[in-house]
């Protein structure tokens, strides 16, 4: 039959994506360095596990994995969509066609002109087990969360406005779990690998994945409302379509280059920005047209009557989540909006924007989560909830913690008080939902109570978030070999710092507290490909209540410490000093240009080599073409009517989200005669601050901080994950009966 033939043709397309994926893995393990993707993200000494995960280390491989996940999700969707299959699969094939078009523009199989003997290597901060599993879980979440959009579009086209929601609920549950797990895995990776002491930095690219998860959460609650009460049909269709559009928008922000100066995760423009922008506009127009056509036939939300407490709770929670998603989306899109209004001066918002707008909403959300298990779908829910409050201590604890919010805000100050209030409300929400989970499990079985366990996990997460932000702030310390220093309650002693021929730096320390035996700790710094600094991994001392976080920022081996500074370079007369930089994040390097205050010239640092003591620059005069220069220390080059001098390297810095920033001090002056030659016989060296000589033996710079209750955060993530998994099992069982 024709439908059966269409199914087999689609399976054939899924097998084709599988074959392409197997081919890419074969190239990665076969060290096919004539393939640009293999050369850019692997090397001969890369362990097999990271050769496997290099598949999604770059944008081209990520697109292919997303297409692979979407292809096989579609195979299951074709069976699960039942009578909506023709319309749903038509839309799904359009989604897969978009991914295929992006792969044709950015193919992971593009060839180089020659075959290098070795690859450039994988960024050290990507060589981590958490990062090996974080991206595929995220892309699986993107694929699964797209299913409700396909079913919603099918429901609109076929006028089956109830049927699509029944079929979508299991997929929305699985998408919520997968995308949420991906976000958590990224947070764990950031905390344990990047060394900035946090797990969420409000980076625009991180936010762009959070927003569809938030709108998907609204959709999930709305689908439950529609299943139980037959309401929320209009907002459900809107949020199903909106979540898919936000997934496309997230991809556009990440890969269009618009966030290149605002995110350490962003890729440069990959050539698909026009395609993605066009796809977003086209899909949005199609969705809007179908909605306008069918909207009058979609039942309006019913008026909530007195006593329908749980339904009101769902609506209020959805409004709060929508408000959080709006503010996160607004802050994330600020670089794009300001770039359109002022192309030469795009700007972004600071993390404080998200904290200020999100904290009150988070407090309100926790109150609603704490009240949820005390309500029911019964019209008499208000009386039942009141009786529950009187009978149960968890309910009283939730109400009591809510009453303490204003008192604590005034007593402890707004920020600290808000964090303590957040922790108390999280405790109340967790307690109330755990109590309801146990009670419902005994009455109806464990899977039926999974949502309450997930809510309890969310409450615990906020307890951990609040506690970890109330710890001792970073305290920096610099140690020379053989030196001991006390930081907080800890004593740190540096035994040695050594470098290897491969450029890896190893520091050996003894860390002790009081009369406890000293811990022997080994810290490593691995060079980032391209000679653009080092990636340092922190040491975390874990205990039941608090993590102590030791984050290295600089490690100088003994042989480099022993060198004496060469005579300082004499700057050009009348020169202005600029400090262009290269910023290296988990997704690669990006230049950070420096412009003269009068706009006469911009200097971009393209590459730097500490070993040879040279830099590669692109000098862009205001009234002339760009000029590419390679300069050694002290050397002067000519760019139009300007003399450009490389004076010395700036300090290596590590940003708040783990990115490395390497700069160079460049002097620019009006040209005077012939540019002088570079100083001869100068030994390449690394500058010491202020020209001071360091004692031989090596040195390390470390910051120490504490993270109270962060273990509760990870526990909450695990509890929420288990509860979500139980809910997914329940919804798919129910879906099989629909």
Name the predicted role of every residue range.
Residues 1-738:
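Solvent-exposed, non-transmembrane regions of integral membrane proteins
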């Amino acid at each position: 039959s024709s439908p059966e033939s269409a199914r087999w043709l689609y399976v054939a397309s899924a097998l084709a994506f599988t074959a392409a994926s197997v081919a890419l893995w074969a190239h990665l393990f076969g060290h096919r360095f004539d393939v640009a993707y293999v050369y850019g993200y692997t090397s001969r000494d890369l362990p097999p596990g990271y050769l496997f995960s290099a598949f999604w280390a770059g944008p081209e491989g990520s697109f292919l994995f997303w297409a692979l996940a979407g292809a096989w999700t579609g195979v299951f969707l074709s069976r699960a969509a039942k009578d909506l299959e023709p319309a749903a699969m038509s839309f799904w094939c359009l989604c897969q066609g978009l991914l295929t078009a992006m792969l044709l523009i950015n193919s992971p199989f593009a060839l180089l002109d020659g075959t290098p003997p070795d690859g450039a290597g994988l960024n050290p901060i990507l060589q981590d087990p958490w990062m090996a599993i974080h991206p595929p879980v995220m892309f699986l979440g993107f694929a699964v969360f797209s299913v409700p959009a396909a079913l919603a579009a099918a429901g609109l086209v076929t006028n089956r406005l109830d049927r699509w929601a029944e079929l979508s609920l299991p997929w929305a549950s699985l998408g919520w779990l997968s995308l949420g797990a991906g976000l958590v895995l990224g947070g764990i990776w950031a905390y344990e690998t990047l060394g900035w002491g946090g797990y969420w930095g409000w980076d625009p690219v991180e936010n762009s994945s959070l927003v569809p998860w938030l709108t998907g959460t609204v959709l999930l609650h709305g689908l439950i409302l529609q299943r139980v009460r037959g309401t929320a049909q209009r907002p459900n269709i809107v949020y199903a379509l909106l979540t898919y559009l936000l997934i496309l928008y997230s991809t556009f922000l990440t890969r269009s280059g618009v966030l290149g100066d605002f995110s350490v995760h962003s890729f440069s423009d990959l050539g698909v920005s026009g395609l993605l922008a066009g796809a977003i506009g086209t899909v949005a127009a199609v969705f809007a047209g179908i909605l306008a056509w069918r909207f009058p036939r979609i039942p309006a939300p019913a008026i909530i009557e007195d006593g329908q407490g749980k339904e009101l709770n769902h609506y209020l929670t959805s409004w709060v989540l929508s408000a959080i998603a709006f503010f996160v989306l607004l802050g994330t899109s600020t670089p794009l909006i300001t770039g359109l209004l002022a192309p030469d001066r795009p700007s972004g918002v600071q993390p404080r924007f998200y904290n200020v707008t999100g904290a009150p909403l988070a407090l309100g959300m926790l109150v609603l989560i704490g009240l949820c298990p005390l309500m029911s779908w019964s019209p008499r829910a208000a009386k039942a909830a009141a009786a529950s409050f009187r009978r149960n201590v968890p309910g009283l604890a939730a109400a009591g913690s809510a009453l303490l919010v204003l008192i604590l805000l005034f007593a402890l100050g707004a920020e600290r008080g808000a964090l303590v209030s957040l922790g108390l409300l999280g405790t109340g929400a967790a307690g109330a939902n755990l109590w309801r989970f146990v009670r419902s499990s005994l009455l109806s079985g464990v899977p039926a109570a999974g949502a309450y366990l997930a809510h309890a996990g969310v409450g615990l997460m906020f307890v951990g978030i609040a506690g970890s932000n109330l710890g001792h702030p970073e305290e920096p310390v610099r140690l020379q070999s053989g030196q001991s220093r006390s930081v907080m309650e800890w004593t740190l002693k540096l035994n040695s710092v050594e470098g290897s021929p491969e450029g890896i730096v190893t520091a050996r320390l003894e860390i002790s507290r009081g009369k406890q035996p000293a811990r022997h700790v080994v810290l490593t710094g691995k060079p980032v490909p391209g000679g653009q600094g080092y990636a340092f991994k922190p040491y975390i001392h874990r205990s039941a209540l608090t993590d102590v976080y030791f984050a290295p920022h600089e490690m100088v081996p003994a042989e480099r410490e022993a060198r004496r500074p060469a005579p300082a370079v004499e700057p050009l007369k009348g020169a202005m000093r600029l400090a262009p930089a290269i910023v290296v994040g988990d997704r690669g390097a990006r230049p950070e240009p420096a412009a003269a205050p009068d706009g006469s010239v911009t200097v971009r640092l393209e590459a730097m080599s500490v070993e040879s003591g040279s830099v590669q620059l692109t000098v862009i005069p205001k009234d002339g073409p760009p000029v590419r220069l390679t300069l050694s220390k002290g050397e002067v080059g000519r760019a139009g009517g300007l003399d450009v001098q490389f004076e010395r390297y700036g300090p290596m810095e590590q940003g708040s989200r783990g990115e490395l920033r390497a700069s160079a001090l460049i002097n620019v002056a009006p040209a005077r005669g012939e540019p002088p030659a570079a100083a001869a016989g100068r030994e390449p060296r690394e500058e010491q601050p202020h020209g001071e000589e360091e004692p031989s033996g090596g040195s390390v710079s470390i910051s120490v901080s504490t993270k109270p209750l962060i273990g509760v955060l990870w526990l909450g993530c695990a509890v929420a994950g288990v509860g979500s998994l139980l809910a997914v099992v329940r919804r798919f069982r129910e879906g099989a009966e629909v």
